[in-house]
Amino acid sequence: MATDELASKLSRRLQMEGEGGEATEQPGLNGAAAAAAAEAPDETAQALGSADDELSAKLLRRADLNQGIGEPQSPSRRVFNPYTEFKEFSRKQIKDMEKMFKQYDAGRDGFIDLMELKLMMEKLGAPQTHLGLKSMIQEVDEDFDSKLSFREFLLIFRKAAAGELQEDSGLQVLARLSEIDVSTEGVKGAKNFFEAKVQAINVSSRFEEEIKAEQEERKKQAEEVKQRKAAFKELQSTFK
């Protein structure tokens, strides 16, 4: 009995080797289950291969960056979804902000640089100094490229809504003048818009007044020096 069983097993093994090692159905499995069992190793191998390829790509990318080959991806160039990242704003608000951003992106490069920001503030009726414009950009410039991406532009309104901007700062003025659309908000919106515009003009006027005051002070000091020199010369002439 044992000899017959051993002979049967050897015969079975020889048959499998003769057929090229093809697997037969496992005992207790139907045809579909056997096919799934046969395909499982292939799927596992494919998944492992895909993971290996992804890991290899990341390692090669990191090696290139370490060797100075290629450029790291800055936050401003990463693809982001404004509707999920800036959930505090409605889709309409984000669309309006995007429309405004594109309006002043004269170079159509996806950024608002210093000169484009200068033009924007002038058109909004709140011109800024060169240092003021640089300060505005620096406050939200996360990647330190000295210009505003659309994401950084949205950060201005996030900070304004959260009360994180100074009352008379350039970014606060920009947010106030930009957030109201007179054509869609009606009389109340127009009232708020012009109130914000008046405040922005007042800030600009105060800045101009400070400059004029400094100029007047310098003129006054120069006049006093001139008068002292004249008095000294007159005093000298009396002793001649």
UniProtKB/Swiss-Prot annotation:
Task: Give residue numbers for the modification (Phosphotyrosine).
Answer: 83
Q: Extract one GO cellular component term from the record.
A: membrane raft
Residues that the record marks as modified (N-acetylalanine) are 2
Which residues take part in binding Ca(2+) 2?
141, 143, 145, 147, 152
Q: Report, as the record phrases it, the tissue specificity of this protein.
A: Detected in thymus, kidney, spleen, lung, liver and brain. Highest abundance in brain and lowest in kidney and thymus.
* Residue numbers carrying Phosphoserine: 11, 74, 76
Q: Where is the EF-hand domain?
A: 92-127, 128-163
Q: Which residues bind Ca(2+) 1?
A: 105, 109, 116
What are this entry's molecular-function GO terms? calcium ion binding
Cross-referenced InterPro entries: AIF-1_EF_pair, EF-hand-dom_pair, EF_hand_dom, EFHD1/2
Q: Where is this region: Disordered?
A: 1-51
- Compartments in which it is found: Membrane raft
The entry describes its oligomerization and partners as:
Interacts with CASP9; with inactive form.
Q: What is this protein called?
A: EF-hand domain-containing protein D2
